[in-house]
Amino acid sequence: MNSISNQTIPHQASRYQAAFSRLKAEGRGAFVPFVTLGDPSPELSLKIIDTLVQNGADALELGFPFSDPLADGPVIQGANLRALAAGTTPTACFELLAKIRAKYPELPIGLLLYANLVFANGIDAFYAKAQQAGVDSVLIADVPVEEAAPFIQAAKAHGIAPIFIAPPNADSDTLAKVSQSGEGYTYLLSRAGVTGADTKAGTPVEEILAKLQEFNAPPPLLGFGIAEPAQVSAAIKAGAAGAISGSAVVKIIETHQQDEVKLLAALGEFTRTMKAAT
């Protein structure tokens, strides 16, 4: 293990850097959808991801199904349960990730998951598998930056960008730590609480964005409650590098899970509309 951590493996944050540079040159922001791998089934999950990318997603944020998601609202919990019912294991998730990476060599791919999944087979082993599958970044939702040292170490040993959440109620100390420890991008919460499609992303974020800039944080993407194009434009106007939409995307999967044609058409339409707002 030591030999690995002593080598300098190039950071996967470079795919994010390339994407953000390209968007900056175009004068646009990023639209990043979130879905749970394997929802509603591993096969359809791949088609869903193809649809998101082909209709303008600038990066992907992907979850591993987990049966006790503390920070997730009912929509994402539903996605977890559907994926688990379809037999989506962590091994199946890594296989899906490798396929996605092979198809889209330049696309930034991030994981958003819970510490239990990372602990299951050892922290280092998880990051090694993530690196092998072509993952660029890992955000562990229930590990604050203050407790993240072992995860950061494993991430860096395997050339993966550790991502941190900047909560809306964070003090300067926390924002400084998030800025120093994070790579790739910063996940900026538009409000505290659980994820959901209904609540407006109404927290004034300009102040946090100014602080993150002052601390030279990786580009901030605004997440939580992003369900409409107007919220994407507002996030970018406020100074975010883009927006992440999870529950709104998963809601479409939930609604049309029995009808593949309608499902992919609705996801394509949603992605195009959200991307157009960047």
From Swiss-Prot:
GO CC terms of this entry: cytosol
The EC number(s) this enzyme carries: 4.2.1.20
Name of the gene encoding the protein in the UniProt record: trpA
GO molecular function: tryptophan synthase activity
PROSITE patterns reported for this sequence: TRP_SYNTHASE_ALPHA
Annotated family: Belongs to the TrpA family.
Catalytically driven reaction(s): (1S,2R)-1-C-(indol-3-yl)glycerol 3-phosphate + L-serine = D-glyceraldehyde 3-phosphate + L-tryptophan + H2O
Naturally occurring in which organism (per UniProt): Shewanella oneidensis (strain ATCC 700550 / JCM 31522 / CIP 106686 / LMG 19005 / NCIMB 14063 / MR-1)
Function: The alpha subunit is responsible for the aldol cleavage of indoleglycerol phosphate to indole and glyceraldehyde 3-phosphate.
Protein name: Tryptophan synthase alpha chain
GO biological process: L-tryptophan biosynthetic process
Keyword Lyase: yes
